[in-house]
Amino acid sequence: CEGMSFEEVVDFAAENHLECLEVACWPQGGASRRYAGVSHIDVAGLTQEKAKYINEYCKKRDVEISSLAYYPNTLEPDLEKRMAYIAHLYKLIDASAMLDVNMITTFIGRDPHKTVTENLEIVKEVWPPILKYAEEKGVKIAIENCPMLFTEDEWPGGQNLMTSPANWRKVFEILDSPNLGINYD
């Protein structure tokens, strides 16, 4: 749905008898990797008025928003980038609550230059405040489980820690929250 407006995406879903969709909500301005930068809802500029319009548009077409989607590497080794990614994730949580979607889909992330054990330590620092905020807003977070392999130098770990049942269990032990789950697709 890259290049399509929010309305075009919803209309496509309705015309093809789809009941719900995950709506891309990347920051405005694009990004360098495939699919990054696609944004059908500008969560940074979302107002109550715009949220009402979005909900009414979907309702008229009998299409539900299942989640708001943003897939950055929240364990990015560059701290400036990491903080920008996390700041947008908070906006996604706010928008999900405002739209009464109450679900976001994202990645846990991974520093591809560190071991699983080292990445789990970063998870302990980065994710508890995000989850606490989501819990306070009544928003669930579903983590996608693909490895995010884009270039040869990311093998074997990729940019997402949530790639195997063993890693899932370790992350869920650290982040014991009823608001955290897996987006299995």
Language-model-derived ranges and their functions:
Residues 3-4, 113:
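Loop/helix-junction capping segments adjacent to catalytic residues or to phosphate/diphosphate-binding pockets
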